[in-house]
Design a protein with these regions (language model features):
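Exposed, low-structure sequence patches enriched in small/polar residues
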Residues: 1-205
């Protein structure tokens, strides 16, 4: 019904094979008695599977990881809202906790109304297809200073985008943590180009 909400989830969390399957449906007028729903009127299917072998002949390598993650979302009448496939092509975890990874994605979206992403930069309604890939590395969180850097490049609505994100973790004193994040985006659209910069700092005590 218009007020209903339903869903189901299956998980298979194991060391070699890790799988997940979930389905969720929210009616157009669903109104939770506690909390809030960020979006109504959709059906969403999300399957994920990962293969994570542990090479016995690579002394410095703890585990490899390969996987694919899908998301298929429609409105209540079955019209496509979003369809995304993320391929985690390769991830390597070393014995010291450091990691390196590479992946790619294909995204299909339907925009039902025009959207002004920035002043005088309007994305018109319609169907959009985008492709992109990312590469990154991170150090172990057990270090007093840990870091992560990732770069993404791909399609973005009517144009292209390049993104660089860095994270820094400082853990010099027990019970006190400092987290910093920096993200830079260089966006080029048919309606114009723009750049964004985001800073985030979190202190945990």
């Amino acid at each position: 019904t218009e007020l209903s909400s339903r869903g189901i989830r299956f998980t298979y969390p194991n060391d070699l094979w890790d799988a997940h399957l979930s389905y969720r449906e929210l009616g157009n007028n669903f109104n939770p008695s506690v909390g809030f729903a960020p979006r109504n009127g959709f059906k969403r299917l999300q399957p994920t599977i990962k293969y994570k072998p542990r090479p016995v002949t690579w002394e410095k390598v703890r585990q490899l990881e390969f996987g694919i993650q899908l998301e298929h979302m429609t409105d209540i009448d079955g019209r496509l809202i979003k369809q995304e496939a993320k391929v985690h092509a390769f991830k390597i975890k070393f014995e010291n906790g450091d990691e390196a990874f590479i992946g790619a994605k294909i995204l299909r979206e339907y925009l039902d109304t025009d959207y002004e992403i920035r002043e005088r930069n309007i994305i018109v309604s319609g169907h959009y297809l985008s492709r992109g890939f990312w590469v990154g590395t991170k150090t172990s969180n057990n270090r007093k200073i840990a870091a992560e850097i990732m770069s993404y490049r791909g399609d973005f609505w009517t144009g292209k985008t390049q993104m660089v994100r860095t994270k820094l973790f400082l853990n010099f004193f027990p019970g006190i943590n400092l987290f910093g994040e920096f993200e830079y985006n260089d966006v080029k659209l048919n309606s114009g180009n723009f750049k964004t910069t985001l800073f985030k700092i979190i202190i945990g005590i």
